[in-house]
């Protein structure tokens, strides 16, 4: 039960932190193997070039799968994530 509460708190804190960071892109914090479902632990944000998926989309990315291996430190691009689209409505 404690781990569920801590996970939820971490999710809220990360979402608030990432939503307040403008002009940042999502970056892999570890090697993400092909067909892996994304979790918050696998992603961070940075002001980086090339510009990739915006930081505010992290909540949408959770549980989406990558369609290729993503090395640690790599900017996540829209074509790397299955079913991700920049034009999709944001909740």
UniProtKB/Swiss-Prot annotation:
Q: Where in the cell is it found?
A: Secreted
Domain (AFP-like) ranges: 25-84
The organism sits in which domain of life?
Eukaryota
Signal peptide span: 1-22
Q: Which PROSITE patterns match?
A: AFP_LIKE
Check the record and name the CDD domains matching this protein. Antifreeze_III
Alphabetized, the UniProt keywords read: Antifreeze protein, Secreted, Signal
Site feature location: Important for ice-binding = 30, 35, 39, 65
| Cross-referenced InterPro entries | AFP_Neu5c_C, AFP_Neu5c_C_sf, Antifreeze_III
Gene Ontology cellular component?
extracellular region
Q: Tell me its family.
A: Belongs to the type-III AFP family.
| Main function | Contributes to protect fish blood from freezing at subzero sea water temperatures. Lowers the blood freezing point. Binds to nascent ice crystals and prevents further growth.
> What name is this protein filed under?
Ice-structuring protein lambda OP-3
Organism name? Zoarces americanus (Ocean pout)
């Amino acid at each position: 039960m404690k781990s569920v509460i801590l996970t939820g708190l971490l999710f809220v804190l990360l979402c608030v932190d990432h939503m307040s960071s403008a002009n940042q892109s999502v970056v892999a914090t570890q090697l993400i193997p092909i067909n892996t479902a994304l979790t918050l632990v696998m992603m961070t944000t940075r002001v980086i070039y090339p510009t990739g998926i915006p930081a505010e989309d992290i909540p949408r990315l959770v549980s989406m799968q990558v369609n290729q291996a993503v090395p640690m430190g790599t900017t996540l691009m829209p074509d790397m994530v299955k079913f991700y689209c920049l034009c999709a409505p944001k909740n």
